[in-house]
Amino acid sequence: MIPKEEIMGIFEKYNKDEVTIVTVGSHTSLHILKGAKLEGFSTAVITTRDRDIPYKRFGVADKFIYVDKFSDISKEEIQQQLRDMNAIIVPHGSFIAYCGLDNVEDTFKVPMFGNRAILRWEAERDLEGQLLGGSGLRIPKKYGGPDDIDGPVMVKFPGARGGRGYFPCSTVEEFWRKIDEFKAKGILTEDDVAKAHIEEYVVGANYCIHYFYSPLKDQVELMGIDRRYESSIDGLVRVPAKDQLELSIDPSYVITGNFPVVIRESLLPQVFDMGDKLATKAKELVKPGMLGPFCLQSLCNENLELVVFEMSARVDGGTNTFMNGSPYSCLYTGEPLSMGQRIAREIKLALELKMIDKVIS
């Protein structure tokens, strides 16, 4: 892990009046960049030339850093270019996937918003389970391996893969049949299979809950809630049951979009309690904790119990559903507030208070 002192040494050489907010052109970059501009920051996007159109058309980026391929963002010349523009990187799922988690931890020497040490805790299922379970949250039962399957389960794989390759099954035979099918399609590798995470299949309504922990205020804020629109499962359910059986199509769970939702108000105490508990436990296990945005992906069962099956320890893709604010984020100040603008506002306040060390790593 890059020492915090080294990152702060780099930041101390910056022109503090010309900080640029930067991210990779993908995932949640539109509201990250737009939010930064609304707070008065200069912005830059890292992109390839064949994917720069959205950032030009929407006008969210002041500068463009072009790479031949996204994995080039970890190269030293790109890092130096970022440091030269006084960059603070806002990481999201695509940034971590392209840069590589090892590089983010050990070689990417550019100041980054949030706690880079916690990113591995969302990527590795055992660490994620340790944090979620240690927080006292209700999580699905975990199975040690396919031979232990004794009922409906969901099989997942590590990393920010947008649900690709996930599948449900009920027996060990079904597990291996689907594994072989996905390997034949090139969706899974032997390494993926070795790291398969098998958990109880919880029946309930899906809620992805987006929080922001402010280290400057020591407070967890509820920013918004969304649901995912997944292919092919959301298209498959439109097919009559008798036709589904005849077609014999195995559903996939690839995230193609998100839509905003509100949760019944009587569940909000539970929602806040979950966020508070996770933020508190994160401070203990991965100091300084869950800085900035995080997400708890949950299912609400018929007993109105929220079961958390996954977390994001950085800005989640579902925050795109409230680029102009959510029914919850607007309650804090009475203004539309995206997650991107909330991030930029925290950075701005940290600079004003000379407490930037509290929000970057």
From Swiss-Prot:
Reaction(s) the record says it catalyses:
5-amino-1-(5-phospho-beta-D-ribosyl)imidazole-4-carboxamide + formate + ATP = 5-formamido-1-(5-phospho-D-ribosyl)imidazole-4-carboxamide + ADP + phosphate
Cofactor(s) the record lists: Mg(2+); Mn(2+)
SUPFAM superfamilies, per the entry: Glutathione synthetase ATP-binding domain-like, PreATP-grasp domain
Kindly state which keywords UniProt assigns to this record, in alphabetical order.
Answer: ATP-binding, Ligase, Magnesium, Manganese, Metal-binding, Nucleotide-binding, Purine biosynthesis
Has UniProt tagged this entry with the keyword Transcription? no
Q: Into which EC class is this enzyme placed?
A: ligase
> Hey, which pathway is this one from?
Purine metabolism; IMP biosynthesis via de novo pathway; 5-formamido-1-(5-phospho-D-ribosyl)imidazole-4-carboxamide from 5-amino-1-(5-phospho-D-ribosyl)imidazole-4-carboxamide (formate route): step 1/1
Q: Name one Pfam family in it.
A: DUF1246
Ranges for the ATP-grasp domain?
A: 116-348
Biological process annotations from GO: 'de novo' IMP biosynthetic process
Amino acids binding Mg(2+): Q297, E310
Q: What does this protein do?
A: Catalyzes the ATP- and formate-dependent formylation of 5-aminoimidazole-4-carboxamide-1-beta-d-ribofuranosyl 5'-monophosphate (AICAR) to 5-formaminoimidazole-4-carboxamide-1-beta-d-ribofuranosyl 5'-monophosphate (FAICAR) in the absence of folates.
How is this protein named in the record? 5-formaminoimidazole-4-carboxamide-1-(beta)-D-ribofuranosyl 5'-monophosphate synthetase
Gene source species: Methanococcus maripaludis (strain C7 / ATCC BAA-1331)
Q: What's the source species' lineage?
A: Archaea, Methanobacteriati, Methanobacteriota, Methanomada group, Methanococci
Which gene is transcribed and translated to give this protein? purP
